[in-house]
Amino acid sequence: MAAKIIGGCCSWRRFYRKRTSSRFLIFSVRASSSMDDMDTVYKQLGLFSLKKKIKDVVLKAEMFAPDALELEEEQWIKQEETMRYFDLWDDPAKSDEILLKLADRAKAVDSLKDLKYKAEEAKLIIQLGEMDAIDYSLFEQAYDSSLDVSRSLHHYEMSKLLRDQYDAEGACMIIKSGSPGAKSQIWTEQVVSMYIKWAERLGQNARVAEKCSLLSNKSGVSSATIEFEFEFAYGYLLGERGVHRLIISSTSNEECSATVDIIPLFLRASPDFEVKEGDLIVSYPAKEDHKIAENMVCIHHIPSGVTLQSSGERNRFANRIKALNRLKAKLLVIAKEQKVSDVNKIDSKNILEPREETRSYVSKGHKMVVDRKTGLEILDLKSVLDGNIGPLLGAHISMRRSIDAI
């Protein structure tokens, strides 16, 4: 009897394990099925969001590009006719101006045609996708095309706003730490990184031509020069000139700063005027200070008191040429600010230094960014330091256009 009970107990245990195993298997299958369903839902939601973003860009391109292309082509034809009736040999300077305008117009036409093609390609992929004729990877391709379209649209729109002298040139940005302290130099390094990331977001290259740190471990930046070798960089960045202040603590007034200056980086031709050799003092700081780059060249313009330098080239000769070009660019900007036609008429006592506060970056509490010139506030410090400064630049450009219109 005992044996039967024991045997029955064993049988029951085997049955229970089997039932439990079966239930566990059914639960696992259901859980797996549920996870697959959720993955499908998430993918569909992502696809819906992707489609909407692409459609928004395509719609904007369809509304904007045809009229813009028609206008640019009309202007191109008119400039070609002007060139036919103009003797290019009579006035070389005027000829260069006409040819440059014609080249710019041709470039705008090609850019708008490319924009239309990419928008049509993205639209076709969306239409095929709605018929389940393509896979998910092609939507990613359409999204990449829509990003190109969006960048091209933004570039074209900005090119119409940035019509001031030198706006279409590249930019040379000179950034200096507000003090020799470690915190200030680390903050300056963050500012440098912010502008590099901004250029990357635009799909453009920005090169740190030279960088110097006075800290023993070489961290941080005491001064740096960034070269933006793409069209309209100067127009984009002109509003960044001034003091960029990091507020570390509102209670103790702890803060540090970096000063930004902007000069044109001429993409087509260097400034076409001569500076008298007698007005220049050329020096090589590395002879006095071993911490400074060996090939650094500084050029001081005696009449204006302006000094520019270069240390990023391979030798002193190349650095001297670059420093002189930077000096000429700075003198042209000052002459424009003072509304004089000749750099020799610059009043050294009225040169505007970049001392005005451009922006405050609050790292405690709300962690926000406040633009002091335009009043714009952005409640996302991290995003701005990651290079998302488009809204800030746009606000400066709009303010400049409003002032010019008065």
UniProtKB/Swiss-Prot annotation:
Function: Involved in the light- and stress-dependent regulation of stability of 3' processed petB transcripts, thus regulating cytochrome b6 accumulation, a rate-limiting step in photosynthetic electron transport. May be recruited to specifically protect petB transcripts against 3'-5' exonucleolytic attack by masking the 3' ends. Does not function as release factor.
Domain of life: Eukaryota
Disruption phenotype: High chlorophyll fluorescence (hcf) phenotype and plant death at seedling stage when homozygous.
Subcellular localization(s) per the UniProt record: Plastid, Chloroplast stroma; Plastid, Chloroplast
Gene that encodes it: PRFB3
Molecular function, one GO term: mRNA 3'-UTR binding
Lineage of producing organism: Eukaryota, Viridiplantae, Streptophyta, Embryophyta, Tracheophyta
Protein name: Peptide chain release factor PrfB3, chloroplastic
Database matches in PANTHER family: PEPTIDE CHAIN RELEASE FACTOR 2, PEPTIDE CHAIN RELEASE FACTOR PRFB3, CHLOROPLASTIC
